[in-house]
């Protein structure tokens, strides 16, 4: 067969690594083995006390001694609250559920606010199900469907059984399978040379990939080549599946319909978002508790992160008080950039961070401090490296001063426009003049407010 390979055009800036988000540079909390934060580490600069406090929280979550508690990240805008929450998730790893949302997301026309919050609570609680299954695993050496006369008569024939030969590192086996499994084999598009495994109880067939013995073949379709399975063909295999409690709620709230036309048409229509009843959740919790007692499953409390918590109203705060006391609850991380302000849904209740006093009493509060000019300079320098931009020293000093006087976000947002201005002028390095030109083109919040105040009839 003729080898055909596709050569993609290399367009500068088009690679996946070139796409940068606001917190691309955050890699973790930047703590040493003793839990002490370094001044510059993991994408963070400064915020030593806040990072060390978050490190203690991560240790408590890993030890499963933190569920049902809440943390508040309190500080001004551009002090790294969202970055801290993101770093907590990266320290916990991908197996721990993390559910981020903003306070305004809880308001819906179809579903009441407390129901939406409860859904997100359940999304942040994981269940790791361990199951030992008997499987046949190996490379397919033979695949022969055997036919028989149709018992109903006529000229057609039916498949009576399927002969499948499997080979592993320690031997071979020939299996005689039920004809219903042949449909699964066809669905998975299994052919001789593929590595598959068949569950002996359910008869489920899974194609793992193509055997690496066929790696020298060339095909138009890209194949995933896998090594020959070790051990015997027939073996016991531990299968671990990670689901959330919300997945179990939805699976039981929306059972699959029948195969008739009316059921199929009902599934095609856009389903209206419905509430999951408390009774159903209670039944799911009982089944989960039974699995945990049997040692089949393990509960993994995750993290629910609510940003702009001051946007919640008094009803949600009241519900949150009760939800934190549930037997199965995640770690709740709240973030607020407000000081003394009125609690939403009330007329005269003024409280710190826009949160009622009774809920504040339950919170562990982590404070984030404003960055100094030297810290802002280091942040801008690191961010410019992430965006592949070169800054001269004078331009870096001006951006650091602007970040201190105006805001860190504004200084960081000027990096890309200044880079484009420098590239237009035929330079790879951003000069002081590029920053000044970008500053003239794009206003910051303070200058925009001054213009509006001096021209009161403008709008």
From Swiss-Prot:
Q: Where does ATP bind?
A: 75-82
Where does this one sit in the cell? Nucleus
Is this entry keyworded DNA repair?
Answer: yes
**What's a Pfam family in this record?**
TIP49_C
Q: Which reaction does it catalyse?
A: ATP + H2O = ADP + phosphate + H(+)
Q: Which SMART domains match?
A: AAA
Uppermost EC category = hydrolase
Tell me the keywords, alphabetical order: Activator, ATP-binding, Chromatin regulator, DNA damage, DNA repair, Helicase, Hydrolase, Nucleotide-binding, Nucleus, Transcription, Transcription regulation
As for family, the record states: Belongs to the RuvB family.
Q: What does this protein do?
A: DNA helicase which participates in several chromatin remodeling complexes, including the SWR1 and the INO80 complexes. The SWR1 complex mediates the ATP-dependent exchange of histone H2A for the H2A variant HZT1 leading to transcriptional regulation of selected genes by chromatin remodeling. The INO80 complex remodels chromatin by shifting nucleosomes and is involved in DNA repair. Also involved in pre-rRNA processing.
By what name is this protein known?
RuvB-like helicase 1
The scientific name of the source species is Eremothecium gossypii (strain ATCC 10895 / CBS 109.51 / FGSC 9923 / NRRL Y-1056) (Yeast)
């Amino acid at each position: 067969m003729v080898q055909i390979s596709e050569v993609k055009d290399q367009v500068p800036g088009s690679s996946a690594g070139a796409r940068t988000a606001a917190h691309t540079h955050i890699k973790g909390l930047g703590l040493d083995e003793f839990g002490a934060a370094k001044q510059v580490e993991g994408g963070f600069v400064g915020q030593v006390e806040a990072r060390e406090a978050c490190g203690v929280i991560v240790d408590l979550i890993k030890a499963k001694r933190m569920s049902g508690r809440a943390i508040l990240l309190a500080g001004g805008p551009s002090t790294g609250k969202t970055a801290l929450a993101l770093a907590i998730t990266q320290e916990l790893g991908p197996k721990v559920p993390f559910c981020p949302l903003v306070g305004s997301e809880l308001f819906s026309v179809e579903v009441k606010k407390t129901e939406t919050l409860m859904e997100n609570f359940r999304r942040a609680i994981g269940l790791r199900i361990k199951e030992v299954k008997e499987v046949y695993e190996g490379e397919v050496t033979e695949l022969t469907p055997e036919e028989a006369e149709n018992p109903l008569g006529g000229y057609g024939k039916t498949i009576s059984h399927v002969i499948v030969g499997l080979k592993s590192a320690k031997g071979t086996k020939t299996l005689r399978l039920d004809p219903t499994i042949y449909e699964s084999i066809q669905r998975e598009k299994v052919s001789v040379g593929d590595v598959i495994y068949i569950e002996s109880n359910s008869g489920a067939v899974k194609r793992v990939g193509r055997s690496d013995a066929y790696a020298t073949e060339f095909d138009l379709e890209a194949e995933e080549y896998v090594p020959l399975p070790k051990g015997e063909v027939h073996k016991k295999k531990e299968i671990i599946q990670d689901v959330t409690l919300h997945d179990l709620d939805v699976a039981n709230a929306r059972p699959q319909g029948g195969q008739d036309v009316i059921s199929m048409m009902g599934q095609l229509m856009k389903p209206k978002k419905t509430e999951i009843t408390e009774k159903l959740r209670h039944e799911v919790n009982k089944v989960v508790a039974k699995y945990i007692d049997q040692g089949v499953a393990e509960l993994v409390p995750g993290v629910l992160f609510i940003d702009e918590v001051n946007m919640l109203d008094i009803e949600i705060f009241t519900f949150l008080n009760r939800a934190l006391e549930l037997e199965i609850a995640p770690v709740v991380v709240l973030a607020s950039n407000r000081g003394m302000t009125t609690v939403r849904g009330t007329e005269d209740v003024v409280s710190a961070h826009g949160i009622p006093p009774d809920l504040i009493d339950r919170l562990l509060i982590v404070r984030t401090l404003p960055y100094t000019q030297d810290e802002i300079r280091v942040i801008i320098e690191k961010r410019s490296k992430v965006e592949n931009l070169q800054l001269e020293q004078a331009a870096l000093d001006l951006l650091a001063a602007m970040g201190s006087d105006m805001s860190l976000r504004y200084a960081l947002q000027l990096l890309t426009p200044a880079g484009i201005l420098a590239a237009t002028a035929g330079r790879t390095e951003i000069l002081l003049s590029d920053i000044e030109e970008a500053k003239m083109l794009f206003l910051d919040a303070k200058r925009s407010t001054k213009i509006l105040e001096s021209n009161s009839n403008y709008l």
